[in-house]
Design a protein with these regions (language model features):
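A short, proline-enriched helix->beta-strand linker immediately N-terminal to the Walker B motif
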Residues: 156-160
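Conserved beta-strand-loop-alpha-helix hinge in the C-terminal portion
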Residues: 216-239
Length: 441
């Protein structure tokens, strides 16, 4: 048995031609805490989403190098690291439901037993104040309590590795220490990697520190060594200023003449595999599969790129039905010219549809998929209304509301954008549940 639960060797990630991570080397012990630091926007979240298997929903996603989890190739594992996404908010259902949803033995427990287990888990997580509020809706809790509960909910499933993305961002300082203490306690039971930007917050998590920039790990050391005496140029700059110069994995050599090379360590050469890229069916930017090759969400064609480029990309991934959720109908002619049928189901921005209308559309989409059609929903950005209807489809097919939202947000954490949409999904589940119960009578 290896001493490491996750081993990355020359691991890289790209989306199409865009290389985000070029050559990451990292070994994660079976138990303990690692803080992942680095400038904003350089791929820390991408690393998490890649090793947790979430980026596979993007048809342009590709990797190279070696990634081993639990001693075997990461791609061969049914179990993956668990992710607590960046800026967790707009959670659904009651406190009780969130605590017990991932319990392996949940189905064998009576309601009273579930309540007893939930209270014990909340106590262990230092969420004592919630033990007598099990029926309260999570969406009504403070942001700090929502983040805390999201980590507990993930830990309840007993994953071997939890990746926590910026848990303290936007929190009141008086709650930060409480949350970090809980993360420290979890790291005594399993491996935990936490992305943080605030160094003072990072220093409260004892363990290892990894500094990621320009597509590779510049430094990986014991926390006190890193904060007191960093060895890399990037580490010294990060401790001094909270950031470090960024040139990217594929840097422009001409641009280097305008930079202070005393502050910069050139990244390793981009591996040959990273450059061996042949364009295939990639889909538009931010296109994501909820069901691979069957059901997807995407932004409005023409919003991110030229409309013909986006429509050609939709055709390449096989989309045959494009459902528009905008208030105003699109011109169907250019869409039809690519062999894609455009359908229109108007929903106001940040709002939710009528329940009966949503049921009709879920029935239609279910029929489309059964007939071999490939369906994509879109609103403007492909997030709120799109995520709501995709989640509704999962509910229509039999998932509980919270399970459906969790499944959708594992693909795109920003799917479902408003309290109105959250409330709709809960009401939609009740309506579908009642409808199918009545049909069974």
């Amino acid at each position: 048995m290896s001493d490491y639960i996750l081993e990355l060797e020359e691991y890289g990630v790209a989306f199409g031609e865009k290389i985000i991570l070029s050559s990451v080397n990292l070994k994660v012990p079976v138990v303990g805490n690692i803080v992942l630091l680095g400038p904003a926007g350089i791929g820390k979240s991408t690393l998490f989403r890649s090793v947790c298997g979430i980026n596979k929903a993007n048809p342009s996603f590709r990797t190279w190098g070696k990634a081993k989890y639990l001693g075997d190739d990461l791609d061969n594992q049914l179990e993956t690291p668990a992710l607590v996404s960046q800026n967790v908010k707009l959670m659904m259902s009651s406190i009780l439901e969130n605590v017990v949803i991932n319990l392996p033995e949940r189905q064998s427990l009576q309601k009273a037993q579930q309540i007893d287990v939930a209270k014990r888990l909340l106590e262990r997580a230092n969420l004592h104040e919630l033990t007598e509020r099990l029926d309260d809706n999570v969406i009504d809790l403070s942001l700090g309590l929502q983040r805390h509960l999201a980590i507990l909910r993930t830990a309840v499933a007993n994953p071997k590795l939890i990746c926590i993305d910026e848990p303290t961002t936007g929190l009141e300082e008086d709650y930060v220490e409480h949350l970090l203490q809980y993360i420290s306690e979890e790291s005594k039971r399993r491996a935990v990697i936490t992305i943080l930007h605030n160094q003072e917050h990072a220093k409260k998590l004892e363990g290892m520190v990894a500094l990621l920039s320009d597509g590779w790990i510049h430094e990986y050391s014991i926390d006190k060594d890193f904060y007191n005496e960093p060895q890399s140029k990037a580490g010294k700059q990060f401790i001094k200023s909270g950031s470090c110069p960024v040139i990217g994995p594929e840097y422009d050599e001409e641009a280097l003449q305008y930079m202070d090379m005393d502050l910069i360590e050139l990244p390793p050469p981009v591996p040959k595999e990273a450059k061996e890229y042949v364009s295939d069916a990639l889909g538009p930017r931010n296109f994501l599969w909820l069901k691979n090759g069957i059901l997807a969400g995407t932004p409005q064609p023409g919003i991110v790129a030229d409309i013909d480029y986006d429509l050609k990309a939709l055709k390449k991934v096989g989309v045959t039905k494009l459902i528009t959720l905008l208030e105003k109908q699109l011109d169907p002619e250019p869409i039809n010219n690519y062999g894609i049928e455009n359908l229109w189901f108007p929903i106001d921005d940040m709002q939710a549809p009528d329940i009966n209308e949503a049921i009709k559309w879920c029935k239609r989409v279910e029929k489309f998929m059964a007939e071999g059609e490939v369906v994509a929903y879109h609103c403007k950005a492909g997030m709120g209304r799109t995520g709501t209807m995709l989640t509704a489809q999962l509910i229509w097919e039999g998932m509980a509301a919270l399970d459906a939202l969790e499944t959708a947000r594992k693909v795109e954490p920003r799917w479902v954008q408003s309290e109105t949409q959250i409330k709709f999904l809960e009401d939609f589940w009740s309506a579908v549940h009642d409808l199918k119960d009545n049909c069974a009578l």
